[in-house]
Design a protein with these regions (language model features):
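Non-transmembrane, aqueous-exposed alpha-helical and coiled segments at domain scale
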Residues: 1-203
């Protein structure tokens, strides 16, 4: 199947979202393949302006399916805010019909945001994107496909919560990530987005 790929030159703010918005009526799918919610594009519908950070800008095209792809690090809480804003404007719930989250995409958890907030040297956005990609590279990050299995494995839950707490202590933070914290977050993600999580590669 032929595809059109829109790539940025280097630093962002090049108008990729606008280009995709104009191209999407010609296509059945809009796929974002990497990145996190440090990105952003603005959608203006009538007198209403929406700021999107994760959902592809093909969103206003009704026939266009939307994919958050394998290479993304996704903050589920930010995603919910974007979806709620769209529902309030249009009455549509794309996550129930045409929004698909790759099961291989990585999850940004509150731990990642906390850890990121301590980095004053690089000057990050503090949204947990760097730490989430670090966990992905080190093969200790949680993908959407992993959530159900982790919830059914008390040993894994304990190991993950201890690792996160240890990493926070190493950068001078006293917050503890308990098993209960982790379980609550993962159960909410699974309950909220189970209809959208899918093996998006074959699509």
């Amino acid at each position: 199947m032929p595809a059109t790929v829109v790539l940025g030159a280097q630093w962002g703010d090049e108008g990729k979202g606008k280009a995709i918005d104009q191209l999407s009526p010609r296509f059945g799918w809009t796929v974002r393949f990497q990145g996190g919610n440090n990105a952003g594009h603005t959608i203006v519908i009538g007198d209403t302006t929406l700021k999107l950070h994760q959902i592809p800008s093909g969103l206003p095209t009704p026939h266009c399916n939307l994919v958050l792809g394998d290479g993304m690090v996704i903050d589920p809480w930010v995603l919910e805010k974007e979806l709620d804003s769209w529902w309030e404007l249009t009455g549509e719930r794309p996550e129930e019909s045409r929004l698909f989250i790759s099961e291989r995409a990585s999850v940004i958890l509150p731990f990642h945001r906390m850890y990121d907030s301590t980095d004053k040297v690089v000057g990050t956005t503090g949204r947990g994107i760097g730490p989430a990609y670090r966990d992905r590279i080190e093969r200790v990050g949680i993908r959407f496909a992993d959530i159900e299995g982790i919830l059914g494995n008390p040993g894994a839950m304990l190991e993950i919560s201890k690792r996160m707490t240890s990493q926070l202590l190493s950068v001078g933070m006293s917050e503890e990530i308990t098993v209960a914290n982790l379980e609550g977050d993962l159960r909410w993600i699974l309950d909220r987005f189970s209809k959208s999580i899918a093996p998006t590669g074959p699509m």
